[in-house]
Amino acid sequence: LSCSFIINYTLNNNNTIRSHNFAYENGLSSVDLKKYKITNPDNILPKLNEISTLQLAQEEWLRLDGAEAAYPVYSAYANACYDGIAKYQYNRNTLQWHEQDKINAEFEKYIAFNNTVYAFTDLINKNCDIFFGAMPSKQQQLEAAALGEELVLTPIAKEAFVFFVNSTNPVNNLTTQQIKDIYNGKTKNWQPLGGDDRRILAFQRPEGSGSQTLLQHIMGDTPIIE
């Protein structure tokens, strides 16, 4: 099993709803990925100046899935290397809506988006071939081992793990230790950190997501607040 390591609701195999209640991609994404979709004729995917030396015929296409942050990466890869992928791009002049639905269903067999938690589940259950995202969590590694699957981790890029504050918050610099103190509940107010006398509301991503796994990696043995 391959992991590329970078830091209408969908139903899974047992008919439970897949959703994180986000605003886009049927509740699976917190950002609109439309501009990164190959099917969008106005997509902003980076493109090569010449044809890729790696060209895969459709019978060789691998089923890709992954994290929200990684979607532009693997979508651009497929756009460059999957021979004939352009046939899935919408033609506004001739394509009817029911035809778009049919094309979407076939296209998403190869370039799917289920975000980290569900995409990883699909990987270890052999419903996708390559997962693009951050390192798997300890729980995800245990799940793979329980199924007798060995994960092959291939680093392809580096990314920064960035913490944001509200635009009205004057705090603009925190140490790693200060962040750890926030997320273990030791620091509960912005004032000691140079901010206003206000309670800290520390946002976390869903368990098993790439961002949450990276947060757990940073925290180490330090417990994280609920």
Roles of regions detected by a PLM:
Residues C3-E226:
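Flexible loop/hinge segments at secondary-structure junctions
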